[in-house]
A protein has these predicted regions:
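A short, Trp-centered hydrophobic/proline-enriched beta-strand micro-motif
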Residues: 117-127
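A short core secondary-structure module
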Residues: 143, 150-186
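Well-ordered alpha-helical segments within folded domains of soluble proteins
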Residues: 91-96
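Alpha-helical interface subdomain recognition
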Residues: 1-80, 84, 90, 102-107, ...
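Flexible, small-/acidic-enriched active-site or ligand-binding loops
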Residues: 133-134, 153-154, 180-212, 217
């Protein structure tokens, strides 16, 4: 009996997303990376499938599904294109989740319905709370506040209709919902190592007004809320890493069987077999951790520590497997004719965009030392 059990609805999600990804995304992934964007037709199809609003309650037009279902969808998407999977992960984990959990009735009605209808949200990732907005200038003019600041990494920024932005003040860190095009806000391109079509870009604010109604989480509870959002995102990011791991392994197995040296396939060489075995071990270890974390969240059980462990294991495993995949491919692993160099760059980028590995290890240690 498998330790991971999925129901019929979740099996259907896996089947539908897998079919969509393998037939429409896999062949387009290289072009998307080259162009640095996801075609509007693909984004529209993702919206029609309900993936942008997968965790949004049905009352707001979403799919109302659980985290296990989200992980299944992200895993299948990432097998074909990690950038697209990351776009969906950010929308659900870093945008939908905080709006669902912390938004007022008015905010939920205004934003969740838009997302379920196809809108995309951006999020400025927070790793070290102490350096958020270190150059942030907040000015007050009576009842109004104005922000001047730069955020060099904003996830989904190039695709987003609105953003969730952390703002640091003397009272702490607040989260604000800011619509695209507000006065004084400008977007600028950034060149990334990996996840090149995921819409990562920068945002700059010059004396932009922050109205009271734009505040999602106040400074008094901002740090706790940000950590809660990160804890949730660990599960989704882990699923993206799992898909990347499987793509690297599948490409390596295929190449090893086809590549001939000294009159036989390199799959017969013990050193290649050892690398493939290590890759498979990492995949299955990550799979168990990820779906355990997801099932605990869905059962309303304590999940944060296992989610951090899953995120560490899967993201570090994806980098390790990516390196092994390049080794298996030899010189071809270095060229863009084969996808493994992209898998590696995407894996390394994914590892750096969430909570940093040292921070997660410290939090795990604190939990077990309580």
């Amino acid at each position: 009996m498998s330790l991971i059990t999925i129901n019929s609805a979740q099996k259907l999600i896996r089947s539908e997303v897998s079919k969509f990804a393998s037939t429409q995304i896999e062949t387009a992934a290289s072009d998307m990376e080259r162009d640095g964007c996801i075609p509007s037709g693909i984004l529209q199809k993702i919206s029609q499938m309900g993936l942008f609003g997968l965790i949004i309650p049905e009352d707001y037009g979403g799919s109302g599904l659980d985290v296990t279902s989200l992980c299944i969808a992200l895993e299948e998407l990432a097998k074909s294109c990690a950038s697209l999977a990351m776009t969906v992960a950010v929308n659900n984990c870093l945008v939908n989740y905080p709006v669902i959990r912390y938004g007022s009735a008015e905010v939920k009605k205004a934003y969740l319905n838009k997302i379920a209808g196809g809108s995309i949200g951006g999020y400025a990732p927070v790793s070290d709370i102490e350096v958020v907005g270190r150059e942030c200038v907040l000015e007050s003019d009576g009842a109004c506040r104005y922000i001047s600041n730069r955020y060099d990494i904003v996830l989904n920024s190039a695709l987003a209709d609105f953003f969730i932005i952390p703002v640091k003040s003397d009272q702490g860190v607040s989260l604000f919902l800011i619509d695209k095009g507000m006065q004084g806000m400008n977007s600028y391109a950034v060149s990334t190592m990996g996840l090149r079509s995921a819409g990562i870009a920068g945002l700059e604010f010059k004396h932009s007004e922050l109205k009271t109604g734009m505040c999602l989480v106040t400074a008094e509870s901002g740090q706790q809320a940000i950590q809660s959002v990160l804890d949730y995102a660990h599960i989704g990011f882990s699923a993206v890493a799992l898909g990347l791991m499987q793509a690297s392994l599948a490409s390596s197995v295929k190449y090893a069987k086809e590549r001939k040296q000294f009159g036989r396939s390199i799959a017969e060489f013990p050193m290649v077999q050892e690398m493939l075995a290590e890759m498979k071990i990492e995949v299955e270890k990550a799979r168990l951790l990820i779906y355990e974390a997801a099932s605990r969240f869905d059962a309303d059980e304590e999940y944060r520590t296992i989610a951090r462990i899953a995120c560490l294991s899967s993201c570090e495993g994806a980098v390790k497997i990516g390196l092994n995949a390049i080794q298996v491919h030899g010189g071809y692993g270095y060229v863009k004719d084969y996808p493994v160099e992209r898998y590696f760059r995407d894996a390394k980028s994914l590892q750096l965009l969430g909570e940093s590995p040292p921070e997660m290890r410290l939090r795990i240690a604190k939990e077990i030392l309580l």
